[in-house]
Amino acid sequence: MDTETVSPNFDDIRPLNNSEVKDAIEKLVANEDFERALRYIKPNLNWEEFSVAMRACKTKEEFKSTLAYDAVMTVAKNTTFSLTISGRSRLPKDKAACTFISNHRDIVLDASFLNVMLYDVGYGMTQVDIGDNLLIRPWIETLVRLNNSFIVKRGVSVRQMLEVSKTLSAYIHHAIKNVNESVWIAQREGRAKDSDDRTQGSVLKMLSIGGDKDNLLLNLMDLNIVPVAISYEFDPCDFLKAKEFQMKRDDPDYVKCQRDDLLSMETGILNNKGRVHFTITSPINDSLAKLDKDMEKNELVSAIASVIDREIYKNYRFYPCNYVAYDLLNGTRRFQEHYGPKDKKQFEEYLQGQLDKIVLPNKDEAFLRKKILEMYSNPLKNYLTTL
């Protein structure tokens, strides 16, 4: 679906309109940093041929379904054993717009992988939220808005936060109701670095405040929320996340910088992820309709978050490494029927290899090992709560 998002109220956050595509493509074709970044993914890229193909794209839809699709599938081919999706029968009928809310593992690929698979099953690609903290270079903002992303403003003052949230929420409601285009948003601000996936109440409150009803629950139901469970066999950034945990433990004032975000994006895109699976879960409006819309606000938000979390926990796909990690972390053999000696040996070798990549002056390997084991066992731990 390729509809203009023309409202001037959203000019600073919306995706590009089709009338802006030509200028955006010219900017990208002339940008050496953009070319350099693409060569990481496609080392043998013929830039002249690619530039011609870029200029042939007259709409966002053409760009997304050809060049962007090809780039994402190249990443999948080079860095995954498989990329699969299930639950397509649960997608809204007649391609009705919805809000996909998922757990969050990879800065770039969560939404990118979801979109190529939705395209393959005939549903169509979504609009995607991206934090402005990741727009480290001007060409990145041009690219993501060309690729139908809208901008989430992160670094604003407390005084500005309410207004920024209202505008963002109003835009999402606009995309769903007026443009009839689905939206992807993570269940929390930033990745769940310990893989303990929990929907943040602040995200749900933000989604509700741009609605046209005076009730939080009804406004969220208007967005037709569909949870998505994302399951990576291996997280290429697990060692970076563990390193950050130790740095924050040792220095409570530690704050990561732009270089860290760039490294995480690059590491996530270029390195092995093994099997990757997306499960489309059931739309939750029927479950939300059973809640008391007049419940105390924070209690209601918590109840809605639990509905989303439960769908994600129940539909997570587990690999041998998840079971091995749980047993190693807890000193048990509870899940030994789900893996063999070879699986255990391979994961232990993988774990040590990731730990060896961490360079810190006071490296606490026992702590780092525990953190990585938690990343792989927490989804299983959360699943067990649904039984």
Put a short name on every predicted segment.
Residues 1-98, 104-115, 119, 141, ...:
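Membrane-anchoring hydrophobic helices of lipid-metabolizing enzymes
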Residues 312-387:
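Long, low-complexity C-terminal extensions of enzymes
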Residues 67, 164-168, 300, 304:
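Soluble or luminal CAZymes and related metallo-dependent hydrolases
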Residues 61-63, 71-284, 341, 351, ...:
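Soluble catalytic domains of membrane acyltransferases
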Residues 46-52, 211-220, 225-231, 293-300, ...:
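C-terminal intrinsically disordered extensions
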Residues 250-327:
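A cross-taxonomic marker for long C-terminal extensions/tails that follow the last structured domain
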